[in-house]
Amino acid sequence: MVKKFVYGTPFETEAVVKEIPSSEGNPDYGTFSTENGFSFTTKLADEDMVFGLGEANRGINKRGFLYISDCADDPNHVESKTSLYAAHNFIIISGKTHVGFFFDYPGTLRFDIGYTTSDTMTVSCENADLYVYMITGDSDLDIVKQFRGIIGRSNIAPKFAFGYGQSRWGYKTEDDFRTVVKKYRENHVPLDMVYMDIDYMQDYKDFTVNEERFPDFEGFVQDMKKEKIHLVPIIDAGVKVEEGYDIYEEGCEKGYFCRREDGSYFEATVWPGWTHFPDVLNADARKWFGDKYDVLVSKGIDAFWNDMNEPSIFYSQEGLADFKETAKKYVEGDPEVPHYMVGGKLQALANNHEDYKRFYHNVNGEQVRHDKVHNLFGYNMTRSAGEAFERISPDKRILMFSRSSYIGMHRYGGIWTGDNCSWWSHILLNLKMMPSLNMCGFLYTGADLGGFGTNTTRDLLLRWLALGVFTPLMRNHAALGTREQEPYQFEHIEDFRNVIGVRYRLVPYLYSEYMKAALNDDMYFKPLAFVYPDDKLARNTEDQLMIGNEIMIAPVYTQNAIGRYVYLPEEMMFVKFLGNGNMFQEVLPKGIHYVEVALNEVPLFIRKGCAIPVADFAESIPDIKEESIRMVGYEGASYERYTDDGVSRI
């Protein structure tokens, strides 16, 4: 059952799409206060677990730490980080009873989950203007499905988006991209997408293409499609301030950029230099910005990724002036200004919360200060595109995913988990984040495989790809200045061919399970706790996940390991895709097992009485042969497979 409670005058985020009548008073769980802002406090029993929060740090069970919903462009994802790129304010308290809460609040929201006091959870925010939805049910999964039912259906990506993609910040010219595709095809490593980072643009201006680097962009797009490759260009949140740039001039003329309190347009620097931000909370501006995607769709593009949309700010005029004044005092020998103060001011320039207080949105004629609704920017930027795609391409799906998000954005696109690093711990973070994202409606998700920042290693990339085989978004992405990490940069290319090839062998199953989850408000990834709630060991296992109703995955995520320990909550069939293209199969009883997994192998476990469809190796999604599909698993088991054309809107 879902109950809705109204506090103060909430901002309409439109995260919830189902009409739910308001209930009087407070939820009959914990204590609620509106004396100093808003707070919800409840005691946690020893056995209680807390699930949710979507894109958040640490484990699947969120007990023992402080999490802050405050979309932040901070690439240093260490354990102490309290905020990442998204704000997903849905939690489930799971113990002897099951209860879920969605705090529909677009500003900064704190979740102290046994951090200050180990047996107490407190959720708080500055202003007592929000909706609180309380959901009760028979199980954690029941609560998730009820919640998903009120926030609307998850976005459905085109089938080609379930192929493998290669990306790197640093591909600049048409020749760069053609070289990447050529090397993949020459080495027979599967590939369906190549991502275009900011260097394809003219001076980092949205909806432009550098004509020197791409003299015939439309022809290039078509050439790539002949190679069965979809190009995926990036779109950033900031619009360059430049006379003669049509997007800038039109936005100024129509009043579609965010303004300062005095009515002038707010300026901050991002990649293009000084920029304005489209006022995507203004319905007219949102439509205007979304329609601009047709500039690229009309040239054959059918996939995009939105970035820098927290929105990220390098510095503002005020921030720069403050830094310059501090630096001047230091240079002049002011004893009150030590060197570390200058360094601190420099670090504080980017994404400074004071800047978020300096600009406003026009929402139905009312001026709303950005910091009060900060977490909605990425959501509404992607919404602008998603709504435009329905007009531009009413019959055909277009791939869209974003960096920043709020619940509700899942209806318009997926997300990638942002600028991670080439750390073994980030494989595990990737794994643990997936079910939490699914709880909040984000099904098309994945991380930068191999790591975005720092330098990857061959073994790290192979192990991460073996997890990426199962994530809907399977993309290798790296930062400018890091070690090149395309598979053909390493020895024994056949190992990469095999691991990535397993993805294509499993697409008949993985795509089917994704579509079932999207159409039935279900989870693609589930924690073991959701499937085996009465098994104490399963409830406390966080480095294994269930996919659909048939399989469990348990990737290797430590360096130099030849395998790993796995807990089986029931009898399962251990299946290993071997480096030579064959499969190893062994039925294992319930219990703890050590399984060996070589670097060029991909393991999975099929539940007792189940089987899954597996195809032959293919180098692209269109090359997967239907007639090659066979069932792998328990003899006599059946599987209901979802199929469609992979293109038409549903």
Annotate each language-model stretch with its function.
Residues 85-89, 96-98, 106, 129, ...:
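Extracellular structured ligand-interaction cores
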Residues 65-71, 84-87, 178, 286, ...:
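Short, hydrophobic/amphipathic alpha-helical packing segments
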Residues 190-496, 531-532:
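Aromatic- and carboxylate-enriched substrate-binding clefts and catalytic-loop regions
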Residues 92-97, 260-262, 569-570, 579:
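Short acidic-glycine loop/turn motifs at beta-strand connectors
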Residues 42-44, 94, 102-105, 113, ...:
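Glycine-rich, histidine-containing beta strand-loop boundary motifs that form or position
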Residues 90, 147, 184, 224, ...:
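A residue-level signal for conserved active-site and pocket-lining positions in enzyme catalytic cores
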Residues 1-158, 168-170, 174, 181-186, ...:
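Catalytic and substrate-binding clefts that recognize carbohydrates or anionic sugar/phosphate headgroups
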Residues 63, 78, 376, 382-398, ...:
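Catalytic core of carbohydrate-active enzymes
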